[in-house]
Amino acid sequence: MRPPSWGTVAKYIWVGWAYLFLLAPMAVVVGSSFDGATAYTGVVFPPQELTIKWYQKIPSAHFHALGLSLGLALSVALGACLLGIPAALGVVRGTIPGKSFFLAFFRAPMQIPAVVTGVAFLRLFYAAGDATGVYLNASFAGLYLGHLFVATPYVIGTVVSVLQRFNMRLEEAAQSMGASRWRTFRRITLPTIMPGVHAGALYAFMVSFSDVPIAMFLTAPGFVTYPVELFFGIETDFNPSVLASASLVIVFSMLALLLVQKAIGLDSVVHSGNSR
């Protein structure tokens, strides 16, 4: 049996370092959450003694914030798909002039710093509130609109990339055999673009769930998303219960990715996203 070449060894070493770089921060967070030191002096890894007491001391506010973030992210992903799919169809199939301009316009929110977006929506909601008496800041609707603004371009981008490779003769063949436009869309177009929809929805969910800058401007005490709650916990009274809370989210996120892989396959999601 021939020994592996230096190139093969170097490849495995490089891949190993890449995995270590990605997994080490999560391993430190999860491992430190089990440290049982009586006097907390900082992040301890590896833990000196094992305990689960910090999981029992996770503040109830973290679970409330987690529920808010999950509900918000799911609704944002759904709304981004409802807005993004028609927009992508209009850009690719429409006969309007200046398609490249509209595509660049739809992608603009991805290029704007999130802090600028948060400030802009805060000022917009205050101005609209002064005019109408309805203030959307520190409300679910306001936070939803802010996240929808930055999440929808991901759905547009992934669906556009699929539509640009779509063979329109399939639709023409279906319509030539008597299928209506709606039936053609439901049976031919929609199943074909679903990998792009899945990719965009996943990106939209992650953008909303992990956002801090926009939520910092659009939340208030008692109405805080999970990342902001973690941020405040680390800033004011950092202790291992914060690490325990973050560890639960890490574990559940990995389980969710496994479910996505089982249901639709991450390969289709990644390929659709990379083709933008």
Where are the regions a protein language model picked out?
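N-terminal, non-cleaved signal-anchor transmembrane helix
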Residues: M1-G67, G71, S75, L259-R276
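C-terminal transmembrane helix and the adjacent membrane-cytosol boundary/short C-terminal tail
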Residues: R2-I13, D35, V160-Q175, R181-L190, ...
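Loop-to-helix entry region at the N-terminal start of transmembrane alpha-helices
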Residues: H64-G71, Y126-V155, P195-G196, A201, ...
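Transmembrane-helix boundary motif in ABC transporter permease subunits
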Residues: M1-G7, L74-F106, V119, R123-A127, ...
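Transmembrane alpha-helices
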Residues: I13-M26, A108, G118, F149, ...
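A structural signal for multi-pass alpha-helical bundles of membrane permease subunits
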Residues: P25-T38, A65, G118-T132, L202-S208, ...
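Interhelical loop and adjacent transmembrane-helix boundary motif
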Residues: R2-T8, A37-T41, T51-A61, F209-L259, ...
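Membrane-interfacial helix termini and adjacent extracytoplasmic/periplasmic loops
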Residues: G42-P47, I52, G98, V115-F149, ...
